Amino acid sequence: MIVANGGVDKIKGIGVGAPNGNYYNGTIEFAPNLPWKGVIPLAAMFEERLGIPTALTNDANAAAIGEMTYGAARGMKDFIMITLGTGVGSGIVINGQMVYGHDGFAGELGHTIIRRENGRICGCGRHGCLETYCSATGVARTAREFLTARTEPSLLRSIPAEEITSKDVYDAAVQGDKLAQDIFDFTGTILGEALADFIAFSSPEAIILFGGLAKSGDYILKPIQKAIDDNILTIYKLSLIHIS
C-alpha cells in the first residue's frame, strides 16, 4: 500500500482504529477480543518501523469521526456511534467533539453490565456485559441457548451448534424461521433498553448503528426502536436510529 501511494515520502501520516485503542497513548490496552494481551504500543511500533507519524484511536471512535465527516452524521454535533461486530463498540460525540475522558477510554458502552445475576461471561473477564448479548457473537450464543431451551423446528438445527453465526440466524429469519426472528427480537430489545439509558446520558440527535449485525435491518431495528420508545422520557423522543 505504501509503495502504491508513492512510497514513504508521499505519506504524511497513518491513522489506526482498533478495539481498546487509547488515543492519548497510541496503545491497544487489554483488548478482550484480540489475541494480544496487555498494553501494545502499536502507534510507536508503526512509527519505528515506517518512520511515519501515527495516530491510534478506538475503532468505534474512528467510525464516528468517519460518519461525522463523510457519512450519516454529517452536520450533527451530538450523536452516539455503536459498532456491532465481534463486540459492541461505541463512540460518543458531544458538541462536535469526541469524548475521550480522563484516561482515553470514555464510552466503553459494550462493557456496561446489563445482567447483574447469571450474566454471560465476557472476554473482559466480567459477567453480563452488553456485548455478550448484542454483538454478532452474542447473537450466536443466544441461538445456542434458544435451540437448547426450545423444541420447535428451526433451520438452525441443521447447523452444528458451535458453528452457528449471526449470519446464519439472519438467513433463517429471512426465510421465516420463527426461532431466528425471536433471537433478533431478544437481541434488539436488550440493545434498545441499553440505548435508552445512553440517550439519557448525552441526549444525542441520533444513534448510528454500524457493522455486520446492523445490516440485519428491520429484524433488529424494530425491536431496538420499540425498546427505546418504551424506556425513554418523552423529552428524548426525537432521537433517531440510523444504520450506516
Per-region residue spans from a language model:
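Short loop/edge segments at beta-strand edges and connector loops
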Residues: L56-A60
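Short glycine-rich anion-binding loops that position phosphate/pyrophosphate groups of nucleotides
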Residues: P19-N22, G85-G87, L213
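Acidic/histidine-rich catalytic cores of soluble enzymes
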Residues: A64
